[in-house]
């Protein structure tokens, strides 16, 4: 595969575009655009039918989408900073068995969207400052059999939105200072939340369904007012995070 390493790109329509290129490495590049309107701007790192690509330690600002994966199975994004892009910091579709780890996605127009994929692992990322009615720290749509662990969601209008997502392991994440920390659509199911921290959010959990189809156990809630008489580390009274106003 190819190697694109340590370059500087300024005001390119598409800075790095890989099409049907297998096993490439895109590392340590500095990509910046002036932030033109979305329809006149392309993506920073764009993968199309490029399996096994590694996107590592790049900085991307002001593009349409910072990083775009489509039909690129088995690829990895690690240690990138994608911020201030017009649409998504990461836009990811139809790419099974991928990992993205230790990336920072900050102040992107619509946040991050991961869609229509299986076996995706999201570990140790920061989803920060996605603000607006259509902005999400992370949108997971039609994602199955994946993991969302050790991530930070902070300062977003909505931290995490799950729509049509199932069989996800959602564990040890921090949700702080979001409008809605987690929004679960009725189509999201069988995705247990364990060991997560919910602090200083306007609303911790909301849903458009009468029942939650995913379990919450062993999480920390700043709004919990119960007690732990047996001192086993878990509250003796269940916490119910969904409030009426979270549904409005």
Segments predicted by a language model, with ranges:
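Extracellular beta-strand/beta-solenoid scaffold signature
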Residues: 1, 10-18, 38-48, 62-68, ...
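Generic detector of contiguous secondary-structure segments
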Residues: 3-26, 100-117, 178, 182-188, ...
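Parallel beta-helix/beta-solenoid
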Residues: 4, 16, 20-21, 26, ...
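Functionally critical loop-and-helix segments that line ligand-binding/catalytic clefts
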Residues: 3, 127, 131-137, 154-155, ...
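Short, flexible active-site-adjacent loop segments at beta-strand->alpha-helix junctions, enriched
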Residues: 8, 22, 30, 51, ...
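Short, conserved, surface-exposed binding loops centered on an aromatic residue
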Residues: 113, 150-151
């Amino acid at each position: 595969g190819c190697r694109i390493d340590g370059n500087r790109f300024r005001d390119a329509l598409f800075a790095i575009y890989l099409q049907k290129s297998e096993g490439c490495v895109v590392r340590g590049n500095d990509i910046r655009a002036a932030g033109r309107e979305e329809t006149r701007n392309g993506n920073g790192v764009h993968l199309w039918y490029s399996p096994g690509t590694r996107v590592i330690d790049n900085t991307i600002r002001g593009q349409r989408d910072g990083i775009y994966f489509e039909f690129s199975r088995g690829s990895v994004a690690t240690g990138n900073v994608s911020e201030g892009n017009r649409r998504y910091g990461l836009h990811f579709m139809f790419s099974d068995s991928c990992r993205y780890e230790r990336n920072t996605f900050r102040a992107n127009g619509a946040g991050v969207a991961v869609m229509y994929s299986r076996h995706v692992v999201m570990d140790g990322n920061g989803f920060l400052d996605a603000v607006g009615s259509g902005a999400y720290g992370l949108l997971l749509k039609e994602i199955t059999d994946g993991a969302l662990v050790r991530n930070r969601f902070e300062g977003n209008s909505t931290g995490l939105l799950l729509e049509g997502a199932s069989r996800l392991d959602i564990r040890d994440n921090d949700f702080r200072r979001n409008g809605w920390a987690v929004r679960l659509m009725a189509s999201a199911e069988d995705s247990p939340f364990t060991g997560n921290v919910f602090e200083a959010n306007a609303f911790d959990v909301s849903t458009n369904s009468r029942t939650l189809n995913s379990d919450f156990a062993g999480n920390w809630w700043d709004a919990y007012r119960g007690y732990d008489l047996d001192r086993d580390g878990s509250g003796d009274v269940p916490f119910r995070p969904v409030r009426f106003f979270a549904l409005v």
